Amino acid sequence: MAGASPIALILGSGPRVGSSIAKSLAEKGYQIVVTSRHGTGAKTPEGYLSYKADFSKPESIPSVFDAIKSELKASPSVVVYNAAAATTPPNQDSVLSLPLDNFNSDLNVNTVSPYVAAQQAVLGWETLPADTKKSFIYTGNILNISILPVPFVLTLGTGKAASAFWLGLSDATYAAKGFRFFYADERNEDGTPVGNNIDGPAHGKFYAQLAGHEQDIPWHATFVKGKGYVEFK
């Protein structure tokens, strides 16, 4: 729709990171669509469209994009994947004791559903004006490059590492069309992982920069609160 505000879709809108990203993008003029297991199909108090989504079922993802096109008459130019899953192996002394069903379910959330979302994003981007900034942003962590000896991160790390690869490959092959893909990873100033001390507003500010293609930030977008993009080697 000519003249309409761009649309940002946040898949996995939690109370800390997801809500901060939504707020930051809304302040940039985006129409916001949020999804979670508790989506209502109506508008939130903030004025965001809210849809229900089960990220353990990748086949359900296209219906979210269809609903957006039906309601807003356009496709999202920014898609943020902020959902994650981690199941602890029942035997802490055997990381491979996790049942296959649990492994598959978590892999769906961490890798397969975001892949399907990226497919849908690209299909939608092809219909948008050429000068519209188009970005797919995945909330990552250090597990794509660092193996921590903690059984709890088995499925989380597997999913992050797998997703980082296809995100990097997608960015390399679609960038010429103006389609950007980012693996966003908040770090401490010394490059160590922030762990559970993630900062919602810092994510919101940085994701808004990524959405607008500000600076020449690579697909592996490591960032520090108060500084923005910082490269760590």
Residue ranges and their predicted role:
Residues 80-92:
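Conserved NAD(P)H cofactor-binding loop of Rossmann-fold oxidoreductase domains
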Residues 56-75:
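Conserved Rossmann-fold cofactor-binding substructure of NAD(P)-dependent oxidoreductases
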Residues 45-60:
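Rossmann-fold cofactor-recognition segment
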Residues 10-11, 81-82, 132-141, 180-185:
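Structural signature of the Rossmann-like NAD(P)-dependent dehydrogenase/reductase core
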Residues 168, 172, 176-233:
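C-terminal helical subdomain
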Residues 11-24:
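N-terminal Rossmann NAD(P)H-binding glycine-rich loop of SDR-like oxidoreductase domains
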Residues 28-43:
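Conserved glycine-rich Rossmann-like NAD(P)H-binding loop of the short-chain dehydrogenase/reductase
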